[in-house]
From Swiss-Prot:
Designated name of the protein: Dihydroxy-acid dehydratase
Assembly with partners or alone: Homodimer.
GO terms (BP aspect): isoleucine biosynthetic process; L-valine biosynthetic process
Gene designation per UniProt: ilvD
Residue numbers carrying N6-carboxylysine: 124
Gene3D superfamilies to which the protein is assigned, alphabetical: IlvD/EDD C-terminal domain-like
PROSITE patterns reported for this sequence: ILVD_EDD_1, ILVD_EDD_2
Cofactors demanded by this protein: [2Fe-2S] cluster; Mg(2+)
Similarity comment: family membership: Belongs to the IlvD/Edd family.
Keyword set, alphabetical order: 2Fe-2S, Amino-acid biosynthesis, Branched-chain amino acid biosynthesis, Iron, Iron-sulfur, Lyase, Magnesium, Metal-binding
Length: 616
């Protein structure tokens, strides 16, 4: 029978000092035999996805206490990728994932907490907490802050839906008037919550459902809706049950590594491909799998991508649907239901509620359930009122979207495409693979060949695009922006958005060893591995080289002879200490970022730290 971890600090005469300090936090004699549960919050006023979380930790804590536990709350940092985008701040985004994971480990292990409730939401916070949860392997439940409502505005006598990406594109489009750009900017992000499309934050929150670590509805129920409060209340109660099951009944099925098994990771990736999730999810799932000591690699993702169709299409791949529409169609469980009926899921998995996949679908799939309360929950919709308050409205759609032929979520027979929304490509400068969000690629450019325009920083590429130096047919290559080379693996949302602003969204390709925002669409290929700074062949591409992209056949090829590439590699190696570094880039890199770069691996490994360099 496992012993409560917290007993280390609450039992025994030699722990008198620790108990004295616990008493100073409000604990009493009666508390010293109870499980101590960490409420891992991420409230900050910097990030709209987290601005409403201040009081939600208290909400969870009250339920933990009522159920017989002791709740202790702390916060992690949270970087807003949208605000950090387009300048040096983006260098810090991906490294913050590791800081978040480490900070959770530090706090939980330093104080010997028995379990956790993770209140996450945005891009690196959910992955960081997920990595920590699987590293620590103590009972955990995720409950996120929820998606933002889609923006809406009237243009040309028509009400259109908007999000952050629209504001960026129109702001850089010289054909758009100042007044229209201002109107879109003011309408794009109307409420608290994670940005309203299937961007990285919402993709990851959906994946925690598929992994079994959060409750049904977590990935899609709006931040502003009153129904979301119940997820927080339930999480506080349920975590105490899971904790007692493990420590008092020796039930290891309550542990995250036994819930988020390899089968669950395969289901999560299947969901991701089917819903056209952010390419960043590949990075984060690979990293989380390593923390769980699960053998889950790019090869597994490649195999899944070849058999899973696209059953859901959401912004940025279409402006017709946002997360509020996914929820109306049944949310994550609705997509999983269609995948299950197509025979594409592992059914022998359980979630934090203790339900198997078939049981979850029977109770929560809107196409199967007979529970009116569940149907009512999935009718939760937007209010269209600007607010930063959680649970501030109770609007509902008149009906569910259960049209699996023409609705937001489709059945296998009516799939958006036979190929899924993500694909892994391999070639002579991406030997370990690269990722493309096929959900956002127009059919006309699934095969594309063009001359390279090479840039050794995102900044130079943006200047060239806005300066008219990139023309239709070009393949923009941005290198030395990987985890080590950036350092920090910046997102390339500005270059891809500006290609659209310049009318080149369907006329150019962009390839990088960096990564893309979940808001990116178009022929945008990222995570090229190995990265240039690690001696990857992307560092050998020269202006004018022809690059052939073949998504249907999963290929990407630099049309240069092996002999020429060998000569270029020899010349690069001859640069000595300057080899595999940018030739003409001035960038201030802090000590913290240099420390991150010294251990960073390429994207095909999840951009995690190289344990071999630490003797691990």
């Amino acid at each position: 029978m496992p012993k409560y971890r917290s007993a280390t600090t609450t039992h025994g005469r030699n722990m008198a000092g620790a108990r004295a300090l616990w008493r100073a936090t409000g604990m009493t004699d009666a508390d010293f035999g109870k499980p101590i549960i960490a409420v891992v919050n991420s409230f900050t006023q910097f990030v709209p996805g987290h601005v409403h979380l201040r009081d939600l930790g208290k909400l969870v804590a009250e339920q933990i206490e009522a159920a017989g536990g002791v709740a202790k709350e702390f916060n992690t940092i949270a970087v807003d990728d949208g605000i950090a985008m387009g300048h040096g701040g983006m260098l810090y985004s991906l490294p913050s994932r590791e800081l978040i994971a480490d900070s959770v480990e530090y706090m939980v292990n330093a104080h010997c907490a028995d379990a956790m409730v993770c209140i996450s939401n945005c891009d690196k916070i959910t992955p960081g907490m997920l990595m920590a949860s699987l590293r620590l392997n103590i009972p955990v439940i995720f409950v996120s802050g929820g998606p933002m409502e889609a923006g809406k505005t009237k243009l040309s006598d028509q009400i259109i839906k908007l999000d952050l990406v629209d504001a960026m594109i129109q702001g850089a489009d010289p054909k758009v008037s100042d007044s229209q750009s201002d109107q879109v900017e003011r309408s794009a992000c109307p409420t608290c919550g994670s940005c309203s499309g299937m961007f990285t934050a919402n993709s990851m929150n959906c994946l925690t459902e598929a992994l079994g670590l959060s409750q049904p509805g977590n990935g899609s129920l709006l931040a502003t809706h009153a129904d979301r409060k119940q997820l927080f209340l339930n999480a506080g109660k349920r975590i105490v049950e899971l904790t007692k099951r493990y420590y008092e009944q020796n039930d290891e099925s309550a542990l995250p590594r036994n819930i988020a098994s390899k089968a669950a990771f395969e289901n999560a990736m299947t969901l991701d491909i089917a819903m056209g999730g952010s390419t960043n999810t590949v990075l984060h799932l690979l990293a989380a799998a390593q923390e769980a000591e699960i053998d889950f690699t790019m090869s597994d993702i490649d195999k899944l991508s070849r058999k899973v169709p696209q059953l859901c299409k959401v912004a940025p791949s279409t402006q017709k649907y946002h997360m509020e529409d996914v929820h109306r169609a049944g949310g994550v469980i609705g997509i999983l239901g269609e995948l299950d009926r197509a025979g594409l899921l592992n059914r022998d998995v359980k979630n934090v509620l203790g339900l198997t996949l078939p049981q979850t679908l029977e109770q929560y799939d809107v196409m199967l359930t007979q529970d009116d309360a569940v149907k009512n929950m999935f009718r939760a919709g937007p209010a269209g009122i600007r607010t930063t308050q959680a649970f501030s409205q109770d609007c509902r759609w008149d009906s569910l979207d259960d049209d699996r032929a023409n609705g937001c979520i489709r059945s296998l027979e009516h799939a958006y495409s036979k190929d899924g929304g993500l694909a892994v490509l391999y070639g002579n400068f991406a030997e370990n693979g690269c990722i493309v969000k096929t959900a956002g690629v127009d059919d006309s450019i699934l095969k594309f060949t063009g001359p390279a325009k090479v840039y050794e920083s995102q900044d130079d590429a943006v200047e060239a695009i806005l300066g008219g130096k990139v023309v239709a047919g070009d393949v923009v290559v941005i290198r030395y922006e990987g985890p080590k080379g950036g350092p920090g693996m910046q997102e390339m949302l500005y270059p891809t958005s500006f290609l659209k602003s310049m009318g080149l969204g369907k006329a150019c390709a962009l390839i990088t060893d960096g990564r893309f925002s979940g808001g990116t669409s178009g022929l945008s290929i990222g995570h090229v591995s190995p990265e240039a700074a690690s001696g990857g062949s992307i560092g050998l591409i020269e202006d004018g080289d022809l690059i052939a992209i073949d998504i249907p056949n999963r290929g990407i090829q630099l049309q240069v002879s092996d002999a020429e590439l060998a000569a270029r590699r020899e010349a690069q190696d001859a640069r000595g200490d300057k080899a595999w570094t940018p030739k003409n880039r001035e960038r201030q890199v802090s000590f913290a970022l240099r420390a991150y770069a010294s251990l960073a691996t390429s994207a095909d490994k999840g951009a995690v730290r190289d344990k071999s360099k630490l003797g691990g």
